[in-house]
């Protein structure tokens, strides 16, 4: 397995798909990496030469934020939104969906498990 930026990339995949195993690299970024480095994106990882791997490593380390650095940046952005009290920050703080989804029936991922509320017993008047 080739190791790029501390992540093991599967050998049996083509290069375009294999790079998407790294957090922060999707299909479009992967295509841009192969275009800028001049490597064929349809070659399987097992057939990459050491020179190809080094080109990809250098390009990623100098041009793209990935893994821990990207996660930290996202975390700081969320903290900043919470501190300034914008709408998205408030939604993050109270644990509701941030991007405009309806919350009457769904959004269980953000709200957590259902909390059952006990009903009050009705008094019978005679």
Swiss-Prot record:
Which Pfam families has this protein been placed in? Answer: Ribosomal_S13
Report the SUPFAM superfamilies cross-referenced here.
S13-like H2TH domain
UniProt keyword annotations, A-Z: Ribonucleoprotein, Ribosomal protein, RNA-binding, rRNA-binding, tRNA-binding
The region called Disordered is annotated at 101-126
InterPro entries on file: Rbsml_uS13_C, Ribosomal_uS13, Ribosomal_uS13-like_H2TH, Ribosomal_uS13_bac-type, Ribosomal_uS13_CS
What do the Gene Ontology cellular component annotations say?
A: cytosol; small ribosomal subunit
One GO BP annotation here? Answer: translation
Gene Ontology molecular function: any one: rRNA binding
Q: Which domain of life is it from?
A: Bacteria
The question of whether Cell cycle is a record keyword is answered with no
Q: Does the keyword Ribonucleoprotein apply?
A: yes
Q: What does this protein do?
A: Located at the top of the head of the 30S subunit, it contacts several helices of the 16S rRNA. In the 70S ribosome it contacts the 23S rRNA (bridge B1a) and protein L5 of the 50S subunit (bridge B1b), connecting the 2 subunits; these bridges are implicated in subunit movement. Contacts the tRNAs in the A and P-sites.
Subunit record text:
Part of the 30S ribosomal subunit. Forms a loose heterodimer with protein S19. Forms two bridges to the 50S subunit in the 70S ribosome.
| Annotated family | Belongs to the universal ribosomal protein uS13 family.
Q: What is this protein called?
A: Small ribosomal subunit protein uS13
Please name the source species. Karelsulcia muelleri (strain GWSS)
Task: Provide the gene name from the record.
Answer: rpsM
């Amino acid at each position: 397995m080739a190791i790029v930026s501390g992540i093991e990339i599967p050998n049996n995949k083509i290069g375009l798909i294999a790079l998407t195993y790294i957090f922060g690299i999707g299909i479009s970024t992967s295509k841009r990496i192969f275009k800028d480095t001049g490597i064929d994106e349809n070659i399987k990882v097992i057939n990459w030469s050491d020179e190809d791997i080094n080109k990809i490593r250098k390009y990623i380390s100098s041009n793209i934020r990935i893994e821990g650095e990207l996660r930290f940046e996202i975390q700081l952005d969320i903290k900043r939104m919470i501190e300034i009290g914008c709408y998205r920050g408030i939604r993050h703080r109270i644990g509701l969906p941030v991007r405009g989804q309806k919350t009457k029936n769904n959004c269980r991922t953000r709200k957590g498990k259902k909390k059952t509320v006990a009903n009050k017993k009705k008094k019978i008047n005679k």
